[in-house]
UniProtKB/Swiss-Prot annotation:
Main location: nucleus
Domain Myb-like, first and last residues per copy: 877-935
Top-rank lineage group of the source organism: Eukaryota
Record-given protein name: Chromatin modification-related protein eaf1
GO BP: any one term: DNA repair
Keyword Transcription regulation assigned: yes
Role: Component of the NuA4 histone acetyltransferase complex which is involved in transcriptional activation of selected genes principally by acetylation of nucleosomal histone H4 and H2A. The NuA4 complex is also involved in DNA repair.
GO molecular function terms listed in the Swiss-Prot or TrEMBL record: chromatin binding
Biased composition (Pro residues): 1162-1174, 1457-1467
Biased composition range(s): Polar residues: 155-174, 244-263, 330-339, 388-401, 1254-1271, 1428-1445
HSA domain: residues covered: 607-686
Annotated region described as Disordered, given as residue ranges: 154-314, 329-402, 469-522, 970-1058, 1113-1202, 1216-1307, 1377-1467
Length: 1467
């Protein structure tokens, strides 16, 4: 369907073109063989139609036949068509009383009229050939009759090109009335003639070939022809108004045929050269002799102007096809174009002649598309002469628009008289129209097609040869001093030069064509829609466009816009939400409409209107159309008349207020034609034109040069060749019609191809045209188009479209609306004019001067800012530049002349957040510009730019080195991973080489909004985290406050109470020590007895493993002279890493062995039944066994004062009783610590931890059990690490615990190792008794723990006394926790002596130890295992306990006056 519509439109267009061509051919045929009565709708005979149809068929384009001039019929015999002289005389008598002309005028008139009569048939000819034949015949006839009366005017010459200045003998006597300006009278018109013919004599195309002097008076001959003899197809000739002699020339018409004060009528065609003037009473037409180039030249004559050359060539080419051998017709290059332009200068005249000075009815022929047939000017139709003057005005209005002839009658600025000389084809045709004919967009045709203001005095070379003699005559007057009139004329000349420039007007398509194209497009859009194709989706074509956008940008599974707005991170106002809500409402409505349309339930959905044949136009339609056209035409004509009257009044005022000298410049010379000459002209016009053609041509060729005065002839001939160049330069530009002033209502235009193109593009307002063949009106729009639309407008929504306006209706601004929150601030900006106009700084027209005075375009860097450092160039992120930004940078640099600060501000984005990719600092812009354009050669060598380039290059090298290092490191890591077989699943991407210089990108990824949102999200999360922490801390603080308030504080004990507690504790300690002493004595006795008997206890294999299993271990041979003398390698190999930090590796095992009571230092080795873990047996160190240097082969002697005093005290107190020693050094029993001194133990829990950290057993605080500290540095470390404050060396733990301080209120953790057990017991008690207070729970748990430990200690003591080491070990391994392990043989020495890496034997004494798995291979000395680190279960940091776990002597032992005592648990 779309294809059919396109095909139909093209076919219609072809049909219109063919119809227009056929109509123009009909007009051509009518102009060639017209007959009287045809133009008055008289019934034409069948023969005419038959011949016309034959002619049309011979040139039918549809049959492939192009136009052929040979198909035109020969011209009819005008002698048979011309009426009798009586009729002609009666038709021209109307103006005879006012004719007052000398002989020269009467001589000129017949010849001119002959030309006027002959020129009309060529009005519609494209080539003008046949018109020339008629011109030749008519002119020859008229010239033959008047040959005897011609004295000053030469006859028509076909070969003469010399300008003829018709100077009569009376010319010197009449200085104001030049002979060339011969005026003629228009005879009266009989009652049967129309006002056109009664006033206008038709202009003959023969004037084209006439010399200027003969062309000047064309009226007499035409008026002498009877109306019956004139060609019936003739167009009513136009009337020339009476010229005002004393008015100055208008700048718009100084080079044209008429001045502004002498409005010229519409001459029918540019091909014709009618200089017609209707005289009312005394109407005058002064014909200035104008140079006209004839078709044929004598061998010695050369065309004087380019236009004449063109005319000559065209005429010679046409003469080859002429029907007669001597054709005088002259055709211009624009002859085919000129038939659509009519010159019309209407001057207000009171008589009927003035009324007939309007247009002819054939404006339809002037329209661009379909001009109507036009009547030649040389033929006067009798029936047409009966038309009223008003009708003739109406008819001529159309013809003036379409074909305006430039009548060369304009006067020179020096005061030439307006001439009515015809436009001869020898020069570019000019047209002058009135300003307001209403035919062109409510403008006058003069405004659009008027002639340019070219002063003829300044531009005598304008190829108007008739004007040149007048210029020469007035030359002396122009040499007078400059006056106001001269100055005004000079101004007009300057304006004329401006108009002479080349055209810059773009010719748009005509409105009709645009409307037709728009209608075609609309119809095609409708066709596309009905054909099922998708119409263009935009707001103008589819009201469902909003719904489409909503569907396109809101996918089915996507997030709705309302949801996004609800969770937006930006601040949204009510208007933002309302906009989205309104869009939802619109989409909901459109969706419902769409659904109803698909269901055929939408009431506005209409069926396509049925195709009906268009209604034929009726007479009423034509009448209404003509009424509209006439209304517009009269309205615009009235405007033009007002403008013309104003200008004439201004000229009159200027003339009145001028002095006589200036009045002479403003005066137009003319004279009144005589009545006698008009009558003579009638008689001469009766002779047949062909009879006198040949003789007349001979006459014309010779006397022409004699008619020009020698002085003027010389001046004209001298300037002729030069004028050719000036004519080319001063050609009026067609575009000048658009720059006319308000006081210019006439305009002269050269008929050049450009001018013709301009005229063709101008839309012409014409009434409806009548088809020539069908005789039906041709409406541009169908008569019923006003109501017969595509859709029946049942509602305003049927033909209208829903449009959504972004601009809201004006409303009162709320106090909450501020200008800085306006989303579109650019709408509020006003373009204010500058306050001072005398400042040239910012005025663009002064830029060249400003640049010349202050050269601001010199190259310079942004020196107002310091040059960036090398560090910046190394660490910056590359800025990204798109192609558009590069072009904008170039433009700004050129416009703002290296003002980098201004350039930077123009390129910097408006956002406050600027990413590195959008960095547009002055130096960044400069660097980018240098990268694009490069530095000037002289600038790049300066020190400043060398430093600049050096910084950039240094930064680039640094960045490149960093990238290479990173790549090498990455490659090495990858190689290591591949060699180790540790290939990860995904390889690391290679490091991308980045640059720091500006780079060009096709599209810059705008991630600043994402980065901004990400930063906002992180900040919000950080704030939330901080808030949560604060809330949690405050919650914990509140809970602590509640617990502290509820927990009763312990009462502060008095010194007496502390003394009592101390006494009770010491008593219990003494009792326990006594019990333990007895057990130890029994054990020692049993061991001694066994040694004497040579029996090895059953536990010996466990103690001394076979040497094979314990290489380098301590031998278990009973004959071994003692452990100190044992293999030292055993010490070095067995326990090099397990010794305490303060014990050197060479120390013997014996120094760490606790000596039994009564056993000397050098006694037999302890190969007896010692349990694997000697800490399980509460042995009592014997101070009576000195440990001399001999007993310590690998231990250096300690010489510190503390050690010396300790040793001395030990020797002095050796002899004291063992019971007293044991009582003094007995550690506090656990049952005394908790129930009686709970608070004190809580305050000194850190000191309680020291004892277990120093040793695994209370009776073995140090590796050297005998109390000799080994390393003071180690003691200091132990003291600093544990914070022990005990004044005793060996009773560090009991003494520290037994001296509680009431100043410290720390929780009672007892020892580090006891906490888990107490906690478990407490949890059991709490589960069984949930209502028991915490104090009772703690007390009960401590009691239970003490009972349990007491039972175990008792069992251990009994087993030790019985010598059953295995049972001791078994008892020791009572699994109160899961960390205890049995001895592991085969590791670093005697396996039996290996102590498991778990808690100590006593839960009370368990201390957290650092997580070290170093085990010490101890031979037979159980004391060496004291330094074994233990696995920790307490909360004390292991870094704090590491030193104390491996400590040797207890710090502060030098202050203790008591020797070390055995520590025996009670009970």
């Amino acid at each position: 369907m779309l294809r059919d519509e396109l095909l139909r439109s093209k076919n219609d267009e072809i049909a219109r073109c063919l119809l227009s061509r056929k109509r123009k051919l009909s007009e051509l045929y009518f102009a060639t063989v017209g007959f009287a009565g045809a133009t008055e709708n008289a019934p034409t005979n069948a023969l005419y139609h038959q011949k016309e149809q034959t002619f049309l068929d011979a040139n039918d384009l549809t049959k492939g036949r192009y136009f052929n001039e040979a198909t035109l019929p020969p011209f009819p015999d005008f002698a048979a068509l011309i009426p009798r002289p009586e009729e002609q005389h009666s038709s021209l008598e109307i103006t005879e009383p006012v004719v007052q002309t000398d002989d020269v005028s009467s001589v000129i008139a017949p010849k001119a009229e002959g030309a006027v009569r002959g020129i009309a048939p060529s009005f519609q000819q494209q080539e003008g050939q046949t018109a020339q034949v008629i011109e030749q015949r008519l002119v020859e006839d008229s010239l033959k009759k008047d040959d005897a009366r011609i004295h000053q005017q030469p006859a028509l010459a076909t070969t003469s090109e010399i300008p003829q200045v018709a100077n009569s003998p009376t010319t010197p006597a009449q200085p104001d009335q030049l002979p060339q300006k011969a005026s003629f009278a228009v005879p009266d018109t009989p009652p049967t003639s129309t006002s056109h013919e009664s006033v206008d004599a038709s202009v003959s195309p023969a004037l084209k070939g006439l010399p200027p002097s003969e062309v000047a008076p064309p009226r007499a001959v035409s008026n002498q022809l009877p109306s019956a003899q004139r060609k019936p197809e003739s167009r009513p000739s136009l009337v020339l108004a009476q010229p005002s002699e004393d008015q100055p020339l208008s700048p718009a018409s100084s080079a044209g045929p008429y001045s502004n004060n002498t409005p010229a009528p519409v001459a029918v065609s540019p091909d014709t050269s009618p200089a017609e003037e209707v005289t009312e009473g005394a109407d005058e037409v002064a014909l200035s002799p104008k140079r006209v180039g004839p078709v044929q030249l004598q061998p010695g004559l050369v065309p004087s102007t380019p236009d004449e050359q063109l005319q000559l060539e065209a005429a010679q080419s046409l003469q080859q096809n002429a029907l007669a051998s001597k054709s005088i017709g002259d055709v211009t290059t624009a002859s085919s174009l000129s038939n659509e332009v009519i010159k019309e200068d209407v001057g207000p005249t009171p008589s009927a002649a003035a009324d007939s000075s309007k247009e002819t009815q054939d404006q339809t022929s002037t329209s661009v598309e379909a001009p109507e047939p036009k009547r030649p000017d040389g033929v006067v139709v009798a029936p047409e002469e009966s038309q009223p003057p008003a009708q003739s005005i109406q008819e001529e209005t159309q013809s003036q628009v379409g074909a305006e002839v430039k009548v060369v009658a304009s006067t020179t600025p020096a005061g030439k008289k307006p001439t009515a000389a015809a436009v001869l084809p020898a020069q570019p045709e000019r047209m002058t129209t009135r300003v307001s004919s209403g035919a062109i967009r409510h403008k006058s045709v003069s405004e659009i097609l008027g002639e340019t203001p070219k002063p003829s005095a300044v531009q005598p070379e304008k190829a108007h040869a008739i004007e040149k003699p007048a210029d020469m005559v007035r030359a002396p007057a122009s040499a007078s001093p400059e006056s106001a009139a001269k100055m005004r004329l000079k101004d007009r000349k300057a304006r004329e030069k401006e108009r002479s420039k080349l055209s810059t007007v773009v010719f748009p398509k005509q409105q009709q064509q645009q409307q037709q194209q728009q209608e075609k497009d609309d119809s095609l859009d409708i066709v596309r829609q009905y054909a099922g194709e998708l119409a263009r989706l935009n707001e103008e074509q589819d009201y469902l466009f909003t719904l489409f956008q909503n569907k396109a940008y809101a996918p089915p599974r996507g997030t709705n816009l309302s949801t996004l707005l609800a969770s937006a991170h930006k601040t949204l106002t009510t208007s933002n939400h309302l906009l989205e809500y309104q869009e939802q409402m619109d989409c909901r409505t459109l969706r419902r409409i769409y659904a109803l349309q698909n269901a055929n339930r939408w009431p506005l959905r209409q069926l396509k209107r049925s195709v009906e044949p268009p209604r034929q136009g009726t007479h009423w339609d034509v009448l209404l159309d003509h009424m509209k056209w006439m209304r517009t035409d009269y309205r615009e004509e009235r405007k033009w008349k007002i403008a013309a009257a104003k200008s004439c009044a201004d000229w009159c005022a200027e003339y009145v207020n001028s002095d006589p000298e200036h009045r002479a410049l403003l005066r137009v010379p003319c004279r009144i034609p005589s009545k006698f000459e008009k009558k003579e002209a009638h008689a001469s016009s009766m002779i047949s034109p062909p009879e006198e053609t040949t003789e007349e041509m001979l006459v014309v060729s010779q006397p022409t040069p004699d008619l020009i005065p020698s002085a003027e002839d010389e001046s004209v001939s001298d300037g002729f060749n030069d004028e050719i160049r000036h004519d080319i330069r001063d050609t009026v530009a067609p575009a000048a019609i658009f720059s006319l002033g308000s006081d210019e209502f006439t305009f002269s235009l050269d008929m050049t191809p450009a001018a013709q193109k301009l005229l063709d593009e101008l839309p012409i307002y014409t009434p409806v045209k009548i088809a020539p063949g069908a005789n039906v009106p041709m409406f541009e729009q169908p008569p019923d188009s006003a109501w017969k639309t595509e859709l029946l407008p049942v509602s305003k929504y049927a033909s209208g479209r829903i449009k959504f306006h972004e601009t809201e209706s004006p409303r009162k601004r709320s106090r909450y609306d501020y200008s800085q929150y306006d989303s579109n601030p650019e709408h509020g900006m006003l373009d204010l004019p500058p306050e001072q106009t005398n400042v040239a700084l910012f005025r663009p027209e002064n830029k060249p001067i400003r640049d010349r005075i202050h050269p601001g375009h010199s190259f310079r860097p942004p020196t107002e800012y310091p040059m960036p450092s090398v560090g910046f160039f190394e660490s910056r992120q590359s800025s990204q530049w798109t192609y558009a930004e590069d072009d904008e940078l170039r433009r700004l640099v050129k416009e703002y002349s290296y003002n980098w600060s201004l350039i930077s501000s123009c390129l910097t984005p408006s956002s406050q957040f600027t990413s590195g990719a959008e960095r547009r600092t002055p130096w960044e812009c400069f660097e980018r510009w240098v990268g694009l354009e490069g530095l000037p050669a002289d600038m790049s060598k300066t020190q400043y730019f060398r430093a600049y380039h050096q910084r950039i290059e240094t930064a680039q090298r640094t960045v490149l080195a960093q990238q290479q290092a990173a790549q090498q490191q990455q490659q090495q890591q990858q190689q290591q991973q591949q060699q180790g077989g540790n290939n990860s699943g995904q390889a690391q991407p290679p490091i991308r080489r980045r640059t720091t210089q500006p780079v060009r990108v096709d599209r810059r990824r705008s991630s600043k909004h994402l980065a901004l949102l990400d930063a906002m999200r992180k900040l919000a999360k950080k704030r939330e985290t901080m808030l949560q922490k604060q809330q949690h801390a405050s919650h914990l603080a509140s809970l602590r406050k509640v617990n502290d308030a509820n927990q009763p504080k312990p009462p502060i004990s008095s010194p007496a109470e502390f003394s009592r507690l101390k006494y009770d504790r010491e008593l219990k300690l003494q009792e326990r020590q006594e019990q333990y002493r007895q057990q130890m004595i029994a054990q020692q006795r049993a061991n001694l007895a066994a040694q004497r008997a040579g029996q090895i206890p059953s536990q010996q294999p466990m103690m001394n493993a076979p040497p094979g299993r314990t290489p380098n271990g301590i031998p278990h041979n009973p004959g071994t002279p003692g452990i100190p003398g044992a293999t030292p390698n055993g010490m070095h190999n067995g326990m090099p890493n397990a010794l305490p930090n303060g014990i050197p590796p060479g120390m013997g095992v014996s120094q760490g062995r606790p000596h039994m009571q009564g056993v000397p230092a050098g006694g037999p080795p302890m190969n007896g039944p010692i349990p694997p873990n000697p800490m399980a047996m509460k042995m009592m160190p014997q101070t009576g066994m000195p440990q001399g240097p001999g007993g310590r082969p690998g231990m250096p002697m300690q010489t510190s004062p503390d050690n010396t005093r300790v040793m001395r005290e030990a020797n002095r107190l050796q002899e004291q009783q063992r019971i007293l020693q044991s009582r003094q050094q007995q550690p506090q029993p656990p049952q005394h610590q908790q129930p009686q001194a709970q608070q004190a133990q809580q305050q000194f829990h850190n000191q309680q931890q020291f004892g277990p950290q120093g040793s695994h057993s209370p009776n073995m605080n140090l590796p050297n059990v005998n109390g000799t500290p080994n390393n003071p540095a180690m003691m200091a470390a132990i003291q600093a690490g544990s914070g022990m404050q005990s004044p005793s060396l060996h009773n560090a733990m009991p003494q520290g615990v037994s001296t509680p301080s009431p100043r410290m209120g720390q929780p009672n953790l007892l020892s580090g190792g006891v906490v888990p057990t107490i906690s478990s017991i407490q949890s059991q008690i709490q589960r069984s008794n949930p209502n028991m207070p915490p104090e009772q729970v703690n007390k009960l748990a401590t009691d239970r723990l003490h009972q349990y430990q007491q039972q175990r200690m008792s069992q251990v003591a009994m087993n030790a006394a019985a010598g059953n080491m295995a049972s001791v070990q078994a008892n020791y391994q009572v699994p109160h926790d899961g960390n205890f392990q049995s001895p592991q043989p085969g590791m670093n020495g005697t396996p039996g002596m290996q102590v498991p890496q778990s808690q100590g034997f006593s839960p009370m004494m368990r201390v957290p130890q650092p997580a070290q798995q170093n085990r010490m291979g101890v031979g037979n000395s159980p004391a060496m295992n004291v330094a074994l680190p233990q696995q920790s279960r307490s909360a004390t940091p292991q870094t704090q306990r590491s030193g104390s776990a491996q400590a040797g002597p207890v710090p502060g032992s030098s202050k203790s006056p008591h020797p070390p005592q055995a520590q025996i648990p009670s009970g």
